[in-house]
């Protein structure tokens, strides 16, 4: 009887210990690791390749600050066109990260632009390129020759209103 109880407990313990391992494996494999690289913190994943960092301050029509969300990074691909409409869409996502479905974008600041800074291997110096935000947009350049993870930064004020 004692041998049978010990055998039963051993089998039961083995089942529970293996179930926790298989759950961790299946949970970690459901995350698409190809698009992100792990940062210093285990819960932080940085996009691999080019990304658009949206860091905006939401103001009303009079310039009073309404919302200052955290920055949000969106993976983008070289060769794609970033239009004003698409950028406003990303800005609204950044606003939603702080105040979900509370605000909508009215307009971007007229001086808003997207900048990327990288070390140019050919010129052997640091370069900063600026891209104006227009209806036609601009094509995201391929900077993989110079930098692996170029960050295209949008840091501006944006006029917003409650939905």
Swiss-Prot record:
The secretion signal range is 1-27
Cellular component GO terms, alphabetical: extracellular region
Subcellular location(s) per record: Secreted
Q: What is its main location?
A: secreted
A Pfam family of this chain: Staphylokinase
* Keywords of this entry: Plasminogen activation, Secreted, Signal
Family matches, as InterPro entries: SAK, SAK/SK_sf
Q: Which Gene3D superfamilies match?
A: 3.10.20.130
According to its UniProt entry, what is the function of this protein?
Potent plasminogen activator that converts plasminogen into plasmin. It forms a 1:1 complex with plasmin, which in turn activates other plasminogen molecules.
Q: Which family does it belong to?
A: Belongs to the staphylokinase family.
Name this protein carries in UniProt = Staphylokinase
Q: Which organism is it from?
A: Staphylococcus aureus (strain MW2)
Classification lineage:
Bacteria, Bacillati, Bacillota, Bacilli, Bacillales
Its encoding gene is what? sak
């Amino acid at each position: 009887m004692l041998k049978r109880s010990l055998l039963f407990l051993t089998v039961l313990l083995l089942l529970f210990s293996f179930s926790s391992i298989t759950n961790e494996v299946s949970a970690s494999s459901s995350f698409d690791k190809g698009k992100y690289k792990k940062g210093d913190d285990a819960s932080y994943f940085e996009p691999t390749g080019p990304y658009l960092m949206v860091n905006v301050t939401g103001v009303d029509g009079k310039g009073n600050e309404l919302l200052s969300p955290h920055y949000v990074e969106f993976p983008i691909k070289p060769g794609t066109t970033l239009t004003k409409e698409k950028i406003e869409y990303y800005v609204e996502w950044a606003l939603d990260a702080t105040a979900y479905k509370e605000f909508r974008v009215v307009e971007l600041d007229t001086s808003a632009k997207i900048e990327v800074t990288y070390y140019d291997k050919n010129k052997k110096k640091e370069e900063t390129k600026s891209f104006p935000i227009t209806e036609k947009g601009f094509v995201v350049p391929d900077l993989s020759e110079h930098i692996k993870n170029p960050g295209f930064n949008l840091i501006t004020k944006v006029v917003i209103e409650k939905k």
